[in-house]
Amino acid sequence: MMPADHSPSAPSWRRVEIALIGTARRLRYAFDHRLAELDLNLNQASLLAFVNDFGGTNQTELAELVGVGRASCGAMIDQLEARGLVTRNPDPHDRRVWLVGITDEGSALVQRFYAVDECFRQEIRHGISREERQQLAALLERLGTNVDAILQTPNPQEKSSVSGRSE
């Protein structure tokens, strides 16, 4: 592990964080821009791909996989169902649950999505060496570990707001 660079020429953490968050936001926007030719956004394409790859899945599982709330997922399923891309079928093991399946038209659209996805990924990787990719992956994994640790600890501000006073 390399020692932290605290020299004046090292970028500030604020600059790094702004770059990371801004890049993630632009990446999402660019992906949605590319998927517009399929009349999909990234969440819809992801949902279709999960259903295509894993078969009948319920709305709760799909919401978790896509990273959206159940209500948002339900609205997406409604939109995709109206377009004839997915179906809702009763779960044979639990009559309260509906499983989302994919139609032939939906499966064909997923194949087009995979082609757009592969092309897009090649474009964003342009000019980044293997060594740079390894460094980036290691740093992002370390940041992810730090974020996971934060999520496992109580928020100190929540404690003070619950009691009505700060400590």
Regions found by a protein language model. Name each.
Residues A63:
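The alpha-helix within a helix-turn-helix
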Residues G69-S72:
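Helix-turn-helix DNA-binding motif, specifically the short coil turn and the N-cap/start of the second
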Residues F54-N58:
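Short capping segments at the starts of secondary-structure elements
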Residues M1-A10, R130-E167:
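C-terminal regulatory/oligomerization modules of transcriptional regulators
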Residues R14-I18, L38-A49, G74:
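Short alpha-helical elements of helix-turn-helix
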Residues R28, D78-E141, T145:
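Charged, amphipathic alpha-helical coiled-coil/dimerization segments
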Residues I21, A49-D53, Y114, E141:
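Short, locally clustered residues in the helix-turn-helix/winged-helix DNA-binding domain
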Residues M1-L38, S166-E167:
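N-terminal leader segment of winged-helix/HTH proteins
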